[in-house]
A protein has these predicted regions:
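Trp- and acidic/polar-enriched beta-sheet ligand-binding modules for extracellular glycan
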Residues: 177-179, 202-299
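Carbohydrate-binding surface patches
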Residues: 194, 619-671, 678-680, 718
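Disordered, acidic Ser/Thr/Pro-rich linker "stalks" and the adjacent N-terminal cap
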Residues: 103-190, 201-204, 214, 225-242, ...
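Noncatalytic carbohydrate-binding groove/subsite architecture in carbohydrate-active enzymes
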Residues: 367, 373, 400-540, 544
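Extended extracellular/luminal ectodomain segments enriched in beta-structured repeat modules
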Residues: 178-180, 188-195, 260-261, 637-638, ...
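Aromatic/acidic polysaccharide-binding cleft in carbohydrate-active enzymes
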Residues: 516-627
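Acidic, Ser/Thr/Pro-rich beta/coil linker or hinge segments at domain junctions
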Residues: 662-713
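N-terminal catalytic cores of secreted or lumenal carbohydrate-active enzymes
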Residues: 29-134, 273-274, 281-462
Length: 728
């Protein structure tokens, strides 16, 4: 999940606070708002509810899979009414190889090590599967449990980082200079640097540069690797180029006078390979480094290392790498990362008999393991029509060209098994300001534009049949949620517009494969803000032409504390876990989902439902909506209008009208109209750290609308549904 910086999140929250401070002047307390549904000749979108309103299942902690997939939990999950399912791949975020079948084959079978391929033949049921840690890991930080460490500064000369062999010209068919591999060191603050020490492994780089980040035009220092994607530049140290590297222990004096730098990277463009006869060709490809140091030479020729060397990811100097070799060993199973087994998922009933959007491990896996996965699913007879390749390559700092090169190889392997299989991705993390990377030679920083360009140059754009991304818009779970919610529609609309500007075709499906309030745990997720954001995300995404949205947090869960300097507890969850054998309690998010699956969209039908745009007159002086609306015309002929009041303190009256044409007279609901409302009258969250619970927990109220302006309670969901005379 791509995280905006805290500064950006605070800025957005401040903008929202300003919006709310001006709202009173813009909208008197007794002002009536008008919501107008624009009944245009062509609807904004068409969808099938079971296919468009979905959820995701993910990897869990130790013992978590068996605890989550109990009969009582599965009944509660299915009762939310969600249809399609996507399988999320936590092992890919953990920098681990995925053994989706515990049975399989090692490339070095006698030693139970090497490159793994799970067994494709259907055998015993698979209930749980695991990730395996990579002993050639280079990055300190990962996006899962973050309990690993880099081998580049672990202080052990016997270990080493090695880049992914599938990015070598042997597999890509391209010159290695087109897929430079790199190591980036973050010193934490500006430090004097004029020397580097590299203990090369095998294979080593024969051509490389040592570069430093020079900052952007604002004059502000970069605080993370993400900040180096701005308009600054990587500059080579005066003596930072090596054109004829010979491996071994190398000490380079980079400059006569130390430079004050924070970020330094080693940029590798040519490999010396490994000696012939070393066995598996993959062991001979790429680059390997045993240990790296960075610092200064003193006047007596001594090297003063600024890098902290320890096998502890919390203590060592943070390092990020371009890729990692998926070679591993049988003893590397991570007990803290479990994935639900395929048989457990497909037999759970959660997919409702629909095709499941399945992943293939890419960044830390092999094409053969992906092909075996597909053969297994076909042998079992499980419905799979699409596979998502990898997870969050952008958040793991993989360049678009490297991901593209892997994508093409995986597409070849999978299409040899099933030429009709739909492939897509890249499962972007959330990026409020766009998905960017270091600029290429043309200055292009757009991750998506460059990925699409790579596929086009390779003649492989047809292999990209759907686009997927995640949407968690609010990093700052400590900020007041009301002001943030007001910003939500603009954030999503701008993100989608940017994607189209960068070349993403509207002719392929766009999928939100995870959505929720935040990538971080906070109380907002357990109560109204999370419920409202979820409903808004689905309604707006479908209105803007999206194909499907998959909720994250399907499994029952409990509040957790994640942000050290903020006393907030929460989680992305529909249901509050009550322990073994007990029915989980529904949360606000659960009832918000049922608003969509049971009342807004017509349930239990595979007929298409049409979405129409709706505009709200309840806006503040900045033009930001206090009330938003999403309208659907159902197969049963009824119109359903979902109304969200994102004002945490004030109720707002609204009148819903339907405008068939600009010159036509607005019409209203004309027959018996159902009203559903869900607000603080039905749900109140009692915060108590890990033991928080709903102190009031009732389903939405249902009554007949009176025909008068409808009063929307503060922080509430409302829905009007009925016939409209003169409209089909």
């Amino acid at each position: 999940m791509k995280h905006t910086t805290l500064i950006r999140a605070i800025a957005l929250a401040m903008l929202g606070v300003l919006a709310f401070s001006r709202a009173a002047a813009a909208q008197p307390p007794d002002a009536q708002g008008v919501v107008t549904v624009l009944v245009t000749p062509r609807p904004a979108n068409t969808f099938v509810a079971a296919q468009a309103l979905g959820a995701g299942v993910d990897g869990l902690g130790q013992g978590g899979v068996a605890k989550a997939y109990t009969p009582v939990n599965l009944r509660a999950m299915r009762s939310a009414g969600l249809g399609a399912l996507t399988y999320r791949l936590r092992t890919e975020l953990a920098v681990e190889a995925w053994h989706w079948n515990p049975s399989g084959h090692w490339s070095e079978g006698a030693k139970a090590q090497g490159y793994w391929t799970s067994e494709a033949l259907a055998g015993a049921p698979i209930s749980t599967c695991y990730g395996y840690r990579l002993p050639r890991r280079g990055s300190t930080i990962d996006q899962a449990n973050n309990d690993g460490y880099s081998r580049l500064d672990d202080g052990d000369a016997r270990t080493f980082w090695k880049s992914n062999p599938y990015l070598d010209r042997h597999f890509t068919g391209e010159d290695n200079a087109k897929h430079p591999q790199w190591v980036l060191i973050d010193l934490g603050r500006r430090r004097p640097v004029n020397a580097v020490q590299i203990a090369w492994g095998t294979p080593y780089a024969t051509q490389y540069q040592v570069q430093y980040w020079d900052g952007d035009s604002s004059g502000e220092d970069a605080h993370s690797i993400d900040d180096t994607f701005g308009d600054g530049a990587w500059r080579m140290f005066p003596s930072g180029a090596e054109a004829e590297g010979r491996g071994g222990l190398v000490r380079l004096r980079l400059a006569a006078v130390p430079r004050s730098v924070r970020f330094v990277r080693v940029w590798m463009t040519r490999s010396g390979g490994a000696p012939v006869g070393t066995g598996d060709i993959r062991d001979t490809l790429g680059y390997a480094v045993q240990e790296i140091g960075l610092g200064t030479w003193d006047g007596r020729g001594g090297f003063h290392d600024l890098v902290r060397h320890t096998p502890d990811g919390k203590q060592q100097t943070p390092i990020t790498v371009s890729s990692t070799d998926p070679w591993h060993q049988a003893g590397g199973r991570d007990p803290n990362v479990e994935q639900p087994g395929f048989d457990r998922v497909f037999r759970s009933g959660l997919a409702n008999g629909l095709p499941v959007l399945m992943p293939a491990g890419v960044l830390y896996d092999t094409p053969g393991n992906a092909a075996a996965e597909l053969r297994f699913l076909r042998a079992r007879g499980y419905p799979v029509t699409r596979m998502e390749l990898g997870e969050e390559p952008d958040g793991q700092y993989v360049t678009p060209e490297d991901y593209g090169a892997l994508y093409v190889q995986w597409a070849d392997a999978l299409h040899r098994v099933d030429p009709a299989l739909g492939l897509g991705g890249p499962s972007f993390q959330t990026a409020i300001d766009g998905w960017v990377c270091w600029p290429d030679a043309r200055g292009d920083r757009s991750w998506l534009h460059r990925f699409l360009g790579y596929l086009k140059r390779r003649g492989r754009l047809a292999d990209f049949s759907f686009f997927s991304f995640e949407w968690y818009p609010f990093d700052n779970v400590c900020a007041p949620p009301g002001p943030q919610l007001v910003l939500a529609p603009n954030l999503l609309e701008n993100a989608l517009a940017r994607l189209q500007q960068e070349g993403l075709s509207r002719r392929i499906p766009w999928l939100i494969t995870e959505y929720g309030y935040s990538a971080f745990a906070g109380e907002a997720e357990m109560t109204w803000p999370g419920a409202l954001l979820n409903a808004e995300t689905v309604g707006q995404f479908l209105t803007l032409g999206g194909s499907a949205a998959y909720l994250y947090g399907y499994e029952p869960n409990v509040p957790i504390h994640e942000i050290e300097d903020c006393p907030t507890w929460g989680n992305l969850a529909l249901l509050l876990s009550e322990g073994a054998g007990r029915s989980p309690r529904p949360l606000a998010a659960y009832y918000a989902v049922r608003f969509l699956t049971r009342e807004w969209a017509q349930p239990d039908t595979d007929k298409p439902q049409t979405v129409y745009r709706a505009k709200s007159g309840l806006r503040n002086r900045l033009g930001l909506p206090l009330v938003t609306a999403y309208a659907v015309h159902r197969p049963d002929g009824q119109w359903a209008v979902l109304l969200l009041n994102k004002d945490p303190k004030k109720a707002h009256p609204v009148t819903v009208r339907f405008q068939k044409a600009k010159s036509g007279r607005p019409v209203s609901f004309s027959g018996p109209t159902d009203l559903y409302q869900y607000s603080a009258s039905q749900y109140v969250w009692h915060p108590d750290k890990a033991h928080g619970y709903p102190s009031l927990n009732l389903p939405p109220r249902h009554l007949q609308a009176s025909g008068r302006p409808l009063m929307l309670p503060p922080f509430s969901l409302s829905l009007l549904r009925g016939p409209v005379a003169g409209l089909p």
